[in-house]
């Protein structure tokens, strides 16, 4: 089977002198604030500040606060890899070709894996002069996901030949791309605009509280129940003398069960469910956390929320020891835990709640580490990928 090898960024062409017209391609909608959407919007916003012309070629999208959105398809809601997402219905190739001819993009930056019904047709219609770049995001949560993606590889194999370079957001995504799609890629990590997080201040209602915070969808995979089980153990075994508050940020189908668990274990007075948190409010909630806990059991290709918390929280960030989160926190394994091991998590929380210096020590390392993921740092690497691909196409 043929391998499609991602080109390395070794061009000597200047990285700062040329304005590019860039089209981000995503089968899903921009209406949800999930990781891939955050990736292209964060990168796109930064690219515009650098003088580039940025467009979004996406599945069915209703929001009107973003410029240059081309909503190309109707989408249907599905569950995949224990996530809720939307998949495009087939798009007219003629319509796609007309858009590509009219806009005349320098670069199409496609999010992988992709559907043959939208992104696949954009790739197939790309003019010869246009560089096609990909970013691989997925980490499988089950064998079924592996099988489904092998089938997707067969369906998109022809379009994959058109790519000039492929990146993966982490080593776990890189391995999956190689094993399932026979794509050799370069790891270029996810990125965050750190500015709103590093300058965030705690919400006034939590300013004087000792807090443990969870932020994410209230679904089984994100592991909020395991955090509550650890909190219940802390209380039942009197592991901590200091009073503290647990803040649960997010909505989802598990909310009723989580509230019921809190009441059954008599921790409802220390647990606050605040519901869905907007992107504008998220930095302040994270800044209110003495300990931010993300007990995801798997299916994570990276951990954008970890970076956001590392940049803004006033204490330690802990992550479930899945491959995606480990790619961010691996240098300090004491910040990783087996998410279903509530005894281990309870002990980690007890140690951090009792010891403010331990929290400060973790925070100092995390604040230093997260700067490597700031969008000006990662963005420059990606622009070099764009220009290297264009240089090769021009030869």
Regions found by a protein language model. Give the residues of each.
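Membrane-proximal helix-turn-helix segments that form the acceptor-binding/catalytic region
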Residues: 149-166, 179
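Short alpha-helical donor nucleotide-sugar binding micro-motif in glycosyltransferases
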Residues: 276-277, 284-289
């Amino acid at each position: 089977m043929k391998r499609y090898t991602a080109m390395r960024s070794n061009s000597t062409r200047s990285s700062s002198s040329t304005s590019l017209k860039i089209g981000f391609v995503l089968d899903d909608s921009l209406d949800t604030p999930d990781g891939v959407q955050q990736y292209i919007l964060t990168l796109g916003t930064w690219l515009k500040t650098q003088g580039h012309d940025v467009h979004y070629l996406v599945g069915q999208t209703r929001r009107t606060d973003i410029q240059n959105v081309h909503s190309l398809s109707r989408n249907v809601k599905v569950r995949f890899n224990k996530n809720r997402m939307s998949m495009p219905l087939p798009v007219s190739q003629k319509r796609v070709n007309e858009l590509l001819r009219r806009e005349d993009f320098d670069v199409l930056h496609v999010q992988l894996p992709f559907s043959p019904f939208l992104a696949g047709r954009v790739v197939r219609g790309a003019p010869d002069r246009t560089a096609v770049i990909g970013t691989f995001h997925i980490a499988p949560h089950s064998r079924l996901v592996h099988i489904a993606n092998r089938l997707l590889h067969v369906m998109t194999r022809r379009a994959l030949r058109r790519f000039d370079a492929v990146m993966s957001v982490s080593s776990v995504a890189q391995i999956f791309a190689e094993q399932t799609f026979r794509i050799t890629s370069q790891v270029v990590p996810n990125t965050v605009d750190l500015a709103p997080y590093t300058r965030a201040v705690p919400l006034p209602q939590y300013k004087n509280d000792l807090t443990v915070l969870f932020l994410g969808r209230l679904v089984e995979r994100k592991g909020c129940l395991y955090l509550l089980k650890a909190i219940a153990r802390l209380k039942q075994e009197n592991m901590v003398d200091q009073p503290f508050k647990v803040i649960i940020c997010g909505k989802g189908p598990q909310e009723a069960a989580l509230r019921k668990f809190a009441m059954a274990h008599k921790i409802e007075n220390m647990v606050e469910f605040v519901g869905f948190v907007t992107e504008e409010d998220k930095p302040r909630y994270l800044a209110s956390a003495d300990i931010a806990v993300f007990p995801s059991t798997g299916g994570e290709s990276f951990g954008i929320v970890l970076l956001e918390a590392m940049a803004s929280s006033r204490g330690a960030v802990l992550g479930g020891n899945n491959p995606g989160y480990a790619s961010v926190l691996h240098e300090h394994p004491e910040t990783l835990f087996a998410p279903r091991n509530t005894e281990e998590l309870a002990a980690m929380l007890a140690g951090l709640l009792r010891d403010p210096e331990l929290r400060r020590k973790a925070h100092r390392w995390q604040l230093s580490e997260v700067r490597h993921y700031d969008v000006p740092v990662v963005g420059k690497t990606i622009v070099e990928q764009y220009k290297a691909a264009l240089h090769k196409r021009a030869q």
